[in-house]
Amino acid sequence: MIRIGPAGNSESFTAMGYKSTPQIPEYLEKMGLNAYEYQCGRGVRINREGVLKLKAGCEARDIQLSLHAPYYISLSSVEEEKRQNSIKYILESAEAADLMGAHRIVVHSGSCAKISREEALSLAGETLKQALAALDEAH
């Protein structure tokens, strides 16, 4: 089945009188949509009660959730600390996604900065392998 829906709350969400994320399932149903990407671009900060309401509403309406991990993830940074922090942010995103019943996490690898694409791809690949191992270990 093809799933279509917004990433975050659009202007029409508030224009239609909705105020908070737990109301998203009702809004999506009215719009004929069946997917929603929860935005954590500026950090994984969730309200547990609100997320559980979102999950219940989406499950009741067959709406599939995904979660967008923080934008500041940098899998290809030349700084080891930034790469390790990126793994931590991915783990935090996975924990939040699990809580809300999201089936996917969207992660951008970051830029090449001052290194070649080949070097950046190599670093990103290695960091992603470490993140996947950490996710396996966490479950």
Regions found by a protein language model. Give the residues of each.
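N-terminal pre-domain/capping segments
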Residues: M1-E92
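Active-site acidic/histidine proton-transfer and metal-coordination neighborhood
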Residues: E59, S76-H139
